[in-house]
């Protein structure tokens, strides 16, 4: 446990609540002290939905600590069962309430006797896993619970659908452009003649989970959530799954070819061939392929970028920049430390260095050291970019409200390639704006601000030196300022004047 004002992946209970609140008619009860119950506010603020967040906090207060939690938790479960009539109630502790070491499974068993809803305890170790791992585990637990329940009741339908069909696993609330990606994936599959069997957990009903085995295969667009469920369904029913993220022209084609291979393994008499579809989409529907050969994109060739995000988006973005756009990825990184080996394997050969960390200060220092032309990362990298005056395109959760757009903005499939091409190009070209404004005027040019992440104490700039610095074009000013301050520190100079600036310049050129 560590104190931090920014976390890339939140605590485990947030992952459980994201999965539970994605399903229809599922209620989550969080056994937590005040302060851990911010999920409702966060989801209500960010997700553009009309429904209330179906999460209730069963608060651990001094009365609970004195008497024990059982009565309060059981009472909350049975009360919500009567009020909401949900299909399922999920009870989850938080890392704080886990310290109490209570037998919550016993509370669940007790509440189940008086509830018409199914009641389960989220089977997650709150000290060992983060938000994404917990979400993956909770989704698999819910699926397993209802598959086992259907087996006992004898109504599990294992007959495959007449036409090829797929389940999409892992689309859920607060995900990065998940709703838009889901629409694009549905469109893609329908154009390939594949029906959608179930989409879980977003908008899905737990009563339909028994129909999951009817699909011909499972599609897992994001590694972070859905993979455990796909592996369970493969082990239990021999269902194949595709886990290649269809992001970018190359990987979308790879994903479609994997689907083609699965469909052809089912019916030897009817052979499907999606090559003509891939060719048509790549050449005429996706604008990204011809854009990457245009003079606009060639201007970006060799430009330096830093990529950081969850494993899925950061790996895909790195490959798109390096392989499809000719951009030099100086560093690719992820905060998914549990998936470090897969990530390193994916980005091998596409970047100069790899960073695996969940500490935002490490990422900030690396960006300040590399000084890329653009950053592609999370909301935190956007903040870092603003402080360093480096443009940033947001490509991964965690994100703020501006990355829950009302318009259609998928990142997957062929329409996603267009969105990514726009994002990349706009991230780079807007960097010239300050420079052009300074040359042609029209705005008050802003004061020279410190562009370093850690403020340099004990260094003062004379007014002459500041005036000289303001004459330098904006897009290199930050670099020159940092180099001059570094030179001054190394030579124990506390006041920076014009002579020091020129001496620093000469020392770099030497």
Curated annotation (Swiss-Prot):
It catalyses: chlorophyllide a + oxidized 2[4Fe-4S]-[ferredoxin] + 2 ADP + 2 phosphate = protochlorophyllide a + reduced 2[4Fe-4S]-[ferredoxin] + 2 ATP + 2 H2O. GO terms for cellular component: chloroplast. [4Fe-4S] cluster binds at residue 36. InterPro entries: ChlB/BchB/BchZ (IPR050152), LI-POR_suB-like_C (IPR013580), Nase/OxRdtase_comp1 (IPR000510), P-CP_red_C (IPR042298), Protochl_reductB (IPR005969), Protochlorophyllide_Rdtase (IPR016209). Pathway: Porphyrin-containing compound metabolism; chlorophyll biosynthesis (light-independent). Pfam families: Oxidored_nitro (PF00148), PCP_red (PF08369). It comes from the Eukaryota. The keyword Nucleotidyltransferase does not apply. Keywords: 4Fe-4S, ATP-binding, Chlorophyll biosynthesis, Chloroplast, Iron, Iron-sulfur, Metal-binding, Nucleotide-binding, Oxidoreductase, Photosynthesis, Plastid. Its cofactor is [4Fe-4S] cluster. CDD domains: Pchlide_reductase_B. Binds 1 [4Fe-4S] cluster per heterodimer. The cluster is bound at the heterodimer interface by residues from both subunits. Substrate binds at residues 431-432. The active site is at 296 (proton donor). Its EC number is 1.3.7.7. It is an enzyme of class 1 (oxidoreductase). GO terms for molecular function: 4 iron, 4 sulfur cluster binding; ATP binding; metal ion binding; oxidoreductase activity, acting on iron-sulfur proteins as donors; oxidoreductase activity, acting on the CH-CH group of donors, iron-sulfur protein as acceptor. GO terms for biological process: light-independent chlorophyll biosynthetic process; photosynthesis, dark reaction. It is found in: Plastid, Chloroplast. SUPFAM superfamilies: Helical backbone' metal receptor. Belongs to the ChlB/BchB/BchZ family. Component of the dark-operative protochlorophyllide reductase (DPOR) that uses Mg-ATP and reduced ferredoxin to reduce ring D of protochlorophyllide (Pchlide) to form chlorophyllide a (Chlide). This reaction is light-independent. The NB-protein (ChlN-ChlB) is the catalytic component of the complex. Protochlorophyllide reductase is composed of three subunits; ChlL, ChlN and ChlB. Forms a heterotetramer of two ChlB and two ChlN subunits. This is Light-independent protochlorophyllide reductase subunit B. It comes from Chlorokybus atmophyticus. The gene is chlB.
């Amino acid at each position: 446990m560590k104190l931090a004002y920014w976390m890339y992946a939140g605590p485990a209970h947030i992952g459980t609540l994201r999965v539970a609140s994605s399903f229809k008619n599922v209620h989550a009860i969080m056994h937590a002290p005040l302060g851990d119950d911010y999920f409702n506010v966060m989801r209500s603020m960010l997700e553009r939905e009309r429904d209330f967040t179906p999460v209730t906090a069963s608060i651990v207060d001094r009365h609970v600590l004195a008497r024990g939690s059982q009565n309060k938790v059981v009472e909350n479960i049975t009360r919500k069962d009567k009020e909401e009539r949900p299909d399922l109630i999920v009870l989850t502790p938080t890392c704080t309430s886990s310290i109490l070491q209570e037998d919550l499974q016993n509370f669940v068993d007790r509440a189940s006797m008086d509830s018409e809803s199914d009641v389960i305890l989220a089977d997650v170790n709150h000290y060992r896993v983060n938000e994404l791992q917990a979400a993956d585990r909770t989704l698999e637990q819910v699926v397993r619970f209802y598959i086992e329940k259907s087996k006992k009741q004898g109504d599990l339908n294992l007959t495959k659908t007449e036409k090829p069909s797929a389940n999409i696993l892992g689309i859920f609330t607060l995900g990065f452009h998940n709703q838009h990606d889901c629409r694009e994936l549905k469109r893609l599959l329908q154009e390939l003649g594949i029906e959608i069997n179930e989409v879980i957990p977003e908008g899905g009903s737990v009563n339909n989970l028994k129909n999951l085995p009817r699909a011909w295969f499972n599609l897992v667009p994001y590694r972070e959530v859905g993979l455990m469920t796909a592996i369970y369904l493969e082990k239990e029913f021999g269902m194949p799954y595709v886990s290649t993220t269809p992001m970018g022209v190359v990987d979308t084609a790879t994903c479609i070819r994997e689907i083609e291979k699965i469909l052809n393994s089912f019916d030897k008499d009817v052979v499907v061939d999606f090559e003509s579809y891939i060719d048509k989409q790549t050449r005429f529907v996706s604008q990204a392929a011809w854009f990457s050969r245009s003079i606009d994109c060639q201007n970006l060739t060799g430009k330096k970028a830093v990529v950081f995000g969850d494993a899925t988006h950061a790996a895909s973005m790195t490959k798109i920049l390096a392989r499809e756009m000719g951009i030099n990825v100086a560093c690719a990184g992820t905060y998914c430390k549990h998936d470090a080996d897969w990530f390193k394997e994916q980005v091998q050969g596409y970047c100069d260095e790899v960073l695996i960390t969940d500490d935002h200060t490490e990422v900030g220092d690396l960006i300040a050291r590399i000084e890329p032309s653009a950053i592609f990362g999370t909301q935190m990298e956007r903040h870092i970019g603003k402080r360093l005056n480096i443009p940033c395109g947001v490509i991964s959760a965690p994100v703020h409200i501006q990355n829950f757009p009302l318009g259609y903005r998928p990142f997957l499939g062929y329409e996603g390639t267009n969105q990514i091409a726009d994002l990349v190009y706009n991230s780079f070209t807007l960097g010239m704006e300050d420079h052009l404004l300074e040359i042609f005027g029209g705005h008050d040019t802003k004061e020279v601000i410190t562009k370093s992440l850690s403020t340099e104490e004990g260094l003062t700039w004379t007014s002459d030196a500041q005036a000289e610095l303001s004459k330098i074009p904006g897009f290199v000013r930050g670099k020159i300022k940092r180099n001059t301050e570094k030179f001054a520190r190394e030579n124990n100079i506390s006041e920076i004047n014009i002579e020091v600036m020129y001496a620093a310049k000469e020392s770099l050129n030497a």
